[in-house]
Swiss-Prot record:
InterPro entries: Aldolase_TIM, Thiazole_synthase_ThiG, ThiG. Homotetramer. Forms heterodimers with either ThiH or ThiS. This is Thiazole synthase. The active site is at K98. Disulfide bonds: none annotated. Catalyzes the rearrangement of 1-deoxy-D-xylulose 5-phosphate (DXP) to produce the thiazole phosphate moiety of thiamine. Sulfur is provided by the thiocarboxylate moiety of the carrier protein ThiS. In vitro, sulfur can be provided by H(2)S. It comes from the Bacteria. It comes from Bacillus thuringiensis (strain Al Hakam). Its EC number is 2.8.1.10. Belongs to the ThiG family. One of its GO terms (biological process) is thiamine diphosphate biosynthetic process. It is found in: Cytoplasm. It holds the Pfam family ThiG.
Length: 258
């Protein structure tokens, strides 16, 4: 398969994995291992990255094996998002940041105005910017025009497990994209992840679908395989949909039974 390129980075895996809500560190580590994810994301606000006394996933992981993707979850406006991003960068984690500015506490949908503003500010600061956005086609285009390094439209609300509720909009975003499109939020099953890849997405970021599964380790492996299968299917090219049947066996040379 073709590698996933985000800014200056290249990855074999197209699965980006969140690190929250796992039952314990052991399950988390095993799930990460079997997923073969190379990019791990985490909320900076949920980890005291400057307090050595506070346990966190960075103590348990061989961070040299992964590209860390801090996110700005908890930010309510662009200024807060930029402040969180700078904290992550100051800790030496990474200059790649997932911009997440929530505009509604019930749906956890992103604030489009503040997301645009935060993305522009962080680009000016030299960050590699991956904004979490809705499936708004125009907003995705405006983010792309700013110069973001990837676009991360939600399949459905965060943690909902509803899967892709608006495949048409998602396909429009993918068709117009000149940067990678990473489907983020709402993925509930391997079928959802495969569908995203079959639509032409460049990758999938998920968390709850794995960490909240009855067996997170098995689900992590299932997600890995479904994303690989979906991407291979997209690259191979599906057959055209037709209203009428077409025989799969050749008819030439067949004898006629009278």
């Amino acid at each position: 398969m073709i590698m996933l390129n985000i800014g200056p980075f290249s990855f074999h895996s197209r699965l980006l994995l969140g690190t929250g809500k796992f039952p314990d560190f052991d399950v988390q580590q095993k799930a990460i291992d079997v997923s073969e994810a190379e990019v791990l994301t985490f909320a900076v606000r949920r980890m005291d990255i400057f307090d050595a006394k506070q346990p966190n996933l960075l103590e348990k992981l061989d961070v040299k094996k992964y590209k860390l993707l801090p996110n700005t979850a908890g930010a309510k406006n662009a200024e807060e998002a930029v402040r969180i991003a700078k904290l992550a960068k100051a800790s030496g984690l990474c200059d790649m940041i997932k911009v997440e500015v929530i505009g509604d506490d019930r749906t956890l949908l992103p604030d489009p105005v503040e997301t645009l503003k935060a993305s522009e500010m962080l680009l000016e600061e030299g960050f590699i910017v991956l904004p979490y956005t809705s499936d708004d086609v125009v907003l995705a285009r405006k983010l792309q025009e700013l110069g973001v390094h990837a676009i991360m439209p939600g399949a459905s609300p965060i943690g909902s497990g509803l899967g892709i509720v608006n495949p048409l909009n998602l396909s429009f975003i993918i068709e117009q994209a000149t940067v990678p499109v990473i489907v983020d939020a709402g993925i509930g099953s391997p079928a959802d992840a495969a569908f995203a890849m079959e639509l032409g997405a460049d990758g999938v970021l998920l968390n709850t679908a794995v960490s909240g599964a009855k067996d997170p380790i098995k689900m992590a492996q299932a997600m890995k395989l479904s994303i690989e299968a979906g991407r291979l299917g997209f690259e191979a090219g599906r057959i055209a949909r037709k209203r009428c049947a077409t025989a799969s066996s050749p008819l030439e040379g067949m004898s006629v039974v009278e």
